[in-house]
Amino acid sequence: MTHLSDLDIANQSTLQPIKDIAASVGISEDALEPYGHYKAKIDINKITPRDSKGKVVLVTAMSPTPAGEGKSTVTVGLADAFHELKKNVMVALREPALGPTFGIKGGATGGGYAQVLPMEDINLHFNGDFHAITTANNALSAFIDNHIHQGNELGIDQRRIEWKRVLDMNDRALRHVNVGLGGPTNGVPREDGFNITVASEIMAILCLSRSIKDLKDKISRITIGYTRDRKPVTVADLKVQGALAMILKDAIKPNLVQSIEGTPALVHGGPFANIAHGCNSILATETARDLADIVVTEAGFGSDLGAEKFMDIKAREAGFDPAAVVVVATIRALKMHGGVAKDNLKEENVEAVKAGIVNLERHVNNIKKFGVEPVVAINAFIHDTDAEVEYVKSWAKENNVRIALTEVWEKGGKGGVDLANEVLEVIDQPNSFKPLYELELPLEQKIEKIVTEIYGGSKVTFSSKAQKQLKQFKENGWDNYPVCMAKTQYSFSDDQTLLGAPSGFEITIRELEAKTGAGFIVALTGAIMTMPGLPKKPAALNMDVTDDGHAIGLF
């Protein structure tokens, strides 16, 4: 049987005018800033909130295969299923990054009949948010280098500048660069480097800000580097927070689009979950809560990364409790964690599913540690067999875990009704949500708590550099920030080859980064990179554009 590609399905779909999508959730035309017929920015100052806030349903996943387990697909499909059940619902997603689109993912707007549209626009440049973030980030780099060139009144030590330039592309050649070469008229030579845009602190700040004032305040607190006597230098010292916020004045507005089935969708912000906090913007989520009874959102990769950061960083900052959490599982991921090679994942292997279930079990138990009841969604693939699916269902029944088979990729919202009904039962019950740790704990104890309670590790080792940073950060008053772990998404450990549910391992923190504007400390583990590289055969090799301007090869 031949299946249509995601792009073919998207191109065959009929979109509703964006003003009609807006009207369906009470957004007036006065609050709408259209970008063509099917996309718009929302002026949140012109929205009238309802008396009660909508409930948040978080979608996370087990540890993924390199291809991903369809978390965005399930997120969109679940929202469509609520729509099918006549619920007042919105979906809130992150924006895709261009780098991974051309690298391995080929796009990130859901899949099959559970997509947000217009798919081409969202996957490419959308409404320009990432370009604005890239520009603001690199403008700050220019201001720093100019300040040093013009006499360096603040005494910035160019050997200790923490701020890097960014680009929305996977480009390993730019990880380490030298700038200011070519003589005195070209600035002061120093070492620099590039991160991918989604790792920029500006991205994190945009996603954690509640208003332009809040955005400006957070930008002003960014630590760009240190003086020669190791005192922090901030954007406020450079006096450019106003200029940077001005660049972002439109980017901070949430973007309204729609699913194939006409469910309103806010797609805004896009930090990665392995190198940043992995959640869409607070503004988009809160705007959706002002307009809908149920808001379905997602956090990147598995519960050990995106969901943990959603609970400990985003929900804490925003001041809301998730009403339910969906953990997406696939038969292929279970088999991979059960020891099956990636080339053999399409073959039936119930024993491997049994062996790999420990990975899903740990993710389920992790969610319970936050005081929220999880619901497992088996995201159906055409190569799954009845025996494999039945084993997972029987495991769930034996362990008193809610579970539903979802077929939203093939059937859209109708394929997610069973999951939606399970989630409805959960959100109607009270929960006892609480973050994993208190902010008053020392940084090293917060890191140890994540490693031992969420990852299953036994010990944290800090490099000599990280130990010095812990001491310095405490002296600077940064000890009460939450922690954002930078770790491989493929394993609970910092070794991506250690699959399943390993225990007793040690995790090494090689370096810490103070994101004082965003308000968290990044702990870098293993070989994690903040500027990815492209694979040997990038998805770009299969991409093209037709003579009439339509994309080919997005998926």
Swiss-Prot record:
Q: Does the keyword Membrane apply?
A: no
Q: Its pathway?
A: One-carbon metabolism; tetrahydrofolate interconversion
Q: What is its EC number?
A: 6.3.4.3
Name the source's superkingdom: Bacteria
The protein's GO terms of the molecular function aspect are:
ATP binding; formate-tetrahydrofolate ligase activity
Recorded hits in CDD domains, A to Z, give: FTHFS (cd00477)
Q: Where does the chain bind ATP?
A: T65, P66, A67, G68, E69, G70, K71, S72
Q: Which reaction does it catalyse?
A: (6S)-5,6,7,8-tetrahydrofolate + formate + ATP = (6R)-10-formyltetrahydrofolate + ADP + phosphate
- What are the GO BP annotations of this UniProt entry? tetrahydrofolate interconversion
Pfam families according to UniProt: FTHFS
Task: Give the record's keywords alphabetically.
Answer: ATP-binding, Ligase, Nucleotide-binding, One-carbon metabolism
Keyword ATP-binding present in the record's keywords: the answer is yes
To which protein family does this belong?
A: Belongs to the formate--tetrahydrofolate ligase family.
Q: What is this protein called?
A: Formate--tetrahydrofolate ligase
Native organism: Staphylococcus aureus (strain bovine RF122 / ET3-1)
**Name of encoding gene:** fhs
